[in-house]
């Protein structure tokens, strides 16, 4: 399960991964992190966090990592971009 802050980030990730199949959760706002934590607790060993590389994303990621200790933060793969969508847009060759 891969958790994203926004829908465009999830679509961008799917574009980057091509045919690889994943299950996704889109928060649509970091204010939904508490609800997401409760829903994700049964999946403890299978959670990747890919929230935004900004202050709100950092706070939400820390809170989720505290509540879901086996979750893995994968935001670094898209640094220094703010999020996956920005990463995709800045690396597209037309």
Walk through the language-model features, giving the residues of each:
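Conserved Lys-Pro-Asp/Glu-containing loop-to-beta segment of HAD-superfamily phosphomonoesterases
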Residues: 1-5, 49
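Helix N-cap/beta->alpha junction signal
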Residues: 5-8, 53
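TOPRIM fold recognition
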Residues: 15-94
């Amino acid at each position: 399960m891969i958790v994203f802050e926004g829908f465009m980030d999830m679509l961008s990730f799917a574009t980057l991964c091509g045919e690889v199949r994943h299950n996704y959760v889109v928060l649509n706002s970091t204010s939904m992190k508490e609800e997401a934590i409760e829903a994700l607790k049964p999946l403890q060993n299978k959670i990747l966090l890919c929230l935004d590389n900004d202050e709100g994303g950092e706070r939400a990621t820390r809170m989720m990592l505290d509540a879901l200790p086996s979750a893995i933060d994968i935001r670094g793969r898209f640094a220094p971009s703010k999020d996956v969508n920005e990463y995709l847009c800045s690396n597209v060759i037309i």
